[in-house]
A protein has these predicted regions:
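Beta-strand-enriched cores of mature, soluble protein domains
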Residues: 1-126
Length: 126
């Protein structure tokens, strides 16, 4: 089953990490609202490296809590990332064992994609 979960970023906050005072890496926390596919919120820890377009990377872990359009309630943790290069490399996975409620037992991939309507997760449940 494929779930398209559209979201918008509500806020992001740069974070300081002790011992990691460098301009080559950035750490942020995000708050997101999911508006379709899953209705709910997510809290995200995001780390990026690189500043030049075509030479950046990121990795993020986020906890999504909400309800699917068919009424299933729960939470699940997703880890995703990518390397902006030619060609780009992107990944995303549901972290095994992190589902609660109706999301318990969820496994599969979860990649961020973009279209004319904005950003969304393409979640492929296995």
């Amino acid at each position: 089953m494929t779930l398209i979960a559209r979201f918008k970023v509500d806020s992001f906050e740069p974070r300081q990490v002790a011992g990691l005072e460098a301009d080559w890496v950035g750490v942020l926390t995000f708050e997101k609202t999911f508006t379709a596919g899953i209705i709910g919120q997510a809290a995200t820890l995001f780390m990026s490296a690189g500043t030049e377009e075509g030479a950046r990377s990121y990795v993020a872990t986020e906890r999504i809590t909400g309800r699917t359009e068919d009424g299933a309630d729960g939470s699940v943790t997703v880890q995703h990332g990518g390397l902006e290069s030619d060609p780009g490399t992107w990944f995303g996975h549901i972290v095994p064992g992190t589902g609660t409620g109706a999301f318990k037992g969820w496994s599969g991939s979860a990649r961020i994609r973009h279209d004319d309507e904005g950003a969304y997760f393409e979640i492929n449940l296995t």
